[in-house]
Each structure stands twice: as C-alpha cells, then as structure tokens.
Design a protein with these regions (language model features):
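Short small-residue beta-strand/loop micro-motif enriched in glycine and branched aliphatics
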Residues: 52-57, 110, 135-137
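Active-site beta-loop-alpha junctions of metal-dependent nucleic acid enzymes
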Residues: 38-39, 56-80
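Short catalytic-loop micro-motif centered on adjacent basic/acidic residues
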Residues: 56, 84-88
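Short conserved beta-strand segments at catalytic cores or DNA/RNA-binding microdomains
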Residues: 34, 38-55, 71
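Generic enzyme active-site microenvironment
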Residues: 30, 46, 87
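Mobile-element integrase/transposase regions
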Residues: 1-43
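C-terminal domain-tail junction helix/linker
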Residues: 135-180
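RNase H-like two-metal-ion nuclease catalytic core shared by retroviral integrases
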Residues: 88-90, 95-101, 110-131, 140-152
Length: 180
C-alpha cells in the first residue's frame, strides 16, 4: 500500500462521470492545499473545472477537520447546480471525505497517487497563486482580505482557454441570477 494514502475507501477518479472530463457541465471542482513556509501553514484552493472560477480558502490549520469544515463552508455558499463533485489528491487533509459528502452532497473523487496531471485546472491555478505568494510564504501572516484580493484578481483575469473571458464573467453568464 502507498504510505501517502491514508484515505479510507476512496472513490477513484476513474469512477467520475464522463461529463467531468469534457468540462461541458459546470459544478465539478478540483481542490488542493497550497503549502506555506516549512509546510506549517496553508491555504485551500477550490477551482471549478468549466469556468476556472477560484475560491481561496483561508485555513488556520491543515488537519482534516479544519479543511473539511472550511471547504464545507465554501460549498454551502454555492447554488446546488454548482455542487456536483470535487476531485482531490490523496492528502491526509481530505481523510474526512465521507463526512464532507454527507454534509454537502458533493461526491469526492481521488486522483491516483503522484498524478497531478489528473487535476490540471487546480495545478495550473496553484501556479498562478504562486505568482502572488511564492514558496516560503507564511500564510499565517496573510490576511483574509489579501487572499480575497488575489482570488478576485485571478477570477477577473481573462483566460485564453475561456476565449479571453474571465472566470468571473464566465460563471456569472452561466448563472446570472446567482450571487457570487
């Protein structure tokens, strides 16, 4: 067994519906942590696969209870049609995936160990976040306001993959009545 896989009964990425891969239907997310200085601090990242819309999640700690509760809080703010699935790596912070699914109705799928290419949207977005917060950043010293500003800048940045629309415009166009 892989020593990095403390996840009990993971649902593997191979079991995701085909629509997740095609990105035709919004509501499928990729999640991760961006670790700070000495791996002691972190922020959570949630990226919607179709629109590339980003939610940066401030974290006081990176244990599974803290991460689950913080991610649940963010998913509760979303309309039901944007809460279809979450694809994650095998980090211990998602050990409470069954509780997360029970509380949010969002099914969690796990990438294969050591396979970051299975979550390309999230890996790319984490790279963009590193433009603002390079490796060695102590996220405990970064305010929620600063995180929100970076989130907004990235969500307002036009993306080639979205035909030079921004993630915010793309998600807003899809859900005109929803307040993000």
């Amino acid at each position: 067994a892989d020593k990095r896989t403390p996840i009990k009964a993971p649902i593997r990425i191979d079991e995701r519906p085909a629509e997740v891969l095609t990105r035709e239907i919004p509501g499928h997310w990729e999640g991760d942590l961006v670790l700070g200085k000495n791996r002691e601090s972190a922020i959570g990242t949630l990226v919607e696969r179709t629109t590339r819309f980003l939610i940066i999640v401030p974290l006081k700690k990176k244990d599974s209870t803290t991460v689950r509760k913080a991610f649940e809080s963010e998913f509760r703010k979303l309309p039901d049609n944007l809460k279809l699935s979450l694809t994650y790596d095998n980090g211990t912070e998602m050990a409470q995936h069954k509780t997360f699914t029970k509380n949010t109705k969002v099914k969690v799928y796990f990438a294969h160990p050591y396979s970051p290419w299975e979550r390309p949207t999230n890996e790319n977005t984490n790279g963009l976040i590193r433009d603002y917060f390079p490796k060695g950043t102590d996220f405990n010293l970064i305010s929620k306001k600063q995180l929100k500003e970076v989130q907004n800048q990235l969500n307002e940045r036009p993306r080639k993959t979205l035909e030079y629309e921004s993630p915010l415009n793309t998600i807003s166009r899809l859900y005109m009545n929803q307040n993000f």
